[in-house]
């Protein structure tokens, strides 16, 4: 995570302005401005070399699906479990540093030119916390809306699934804002989540109520 300096805050404000101005034209990860766009280009080169699918999740997916106030520092991508080792090998010679992480921590790389960190969410791993693990694991990126060789955003229902699995306060806040931004998609989201796990369906029902209460105030 970048240090909070005046220069960093200025860059973040400029980024927020760019994102707001280009919101209606930035439909794909490749459309992101500035250093984040350069990281996506570098990731695409790695993915194209491997013909590997990857789904962009996390804060950038939240922004893409309508929570326009959400600006994040890192990039989160879902990769197939069997492709992670070769992804890291190619990334290491394609403009990224592979970080050394403790056992049990998911892989991370840093884009050398921009300093942007890329957090890898491995298919089959269990989100949540050690004290409160999710009842499901991370799906294959192709199930989330990915395609081989190029980074794609996770679909809105899949993003909700991942957020419900993580279940942090920030994730719940993101879900509420996404529900408020996408009222016409609530039924589709509800159907998807119900098919994943009953716990998620119950949690989503509570968050839908929270979103409705906020809209009424």
Language-model features: locations:
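Compositionally biased terminal segments of proteins
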Residues: 2-217
């Amino acid at each position: 995570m970048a240090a909070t300096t005046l220069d960093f805050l200025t860059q973040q404000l400029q980024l927020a302005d760019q994102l707001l101005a280009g919101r209606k034209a930035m439909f794909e990860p490749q459309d992101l401005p500035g250093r984040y766009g350069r990281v996506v280009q570098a990731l695409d080169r790695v993915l194209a070399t491997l013909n590997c699918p990857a789904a962009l999740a996390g804060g950038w997916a939240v922004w893409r699906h309508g929570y326009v106030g959400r600006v994040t520092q890192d990039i989160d991508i879902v990769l197939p479990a069997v492709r992670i080792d070769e992804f890291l090998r190619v990334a290491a010679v394609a403009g990224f540093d592979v970080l050394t992480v403790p056992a049990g921590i998911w892989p991370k790389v840093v884009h050398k030119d921009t300093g942007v960190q890329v957090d890898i969410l491995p298919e089959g791993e269990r989100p949540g916390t050690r004290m409160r693990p999710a009842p499901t694991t991370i799906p294959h990126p192709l199930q989330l809306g990915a395609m081989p060789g190029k980074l794609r955003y996770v679909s809105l229902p899949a993003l909700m699934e991942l957020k419900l699995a993580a279940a942090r306060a920030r994730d719940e806040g993101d879900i509420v804002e996404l529900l408020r931004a996408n009222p016409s998609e609530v039924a589709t989201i509800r159907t998807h989540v119900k098919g994943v796990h009953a716990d998620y369906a119950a949690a989503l029902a509570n968050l839908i109520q929270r979103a409705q209460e906020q809209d009424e105030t």
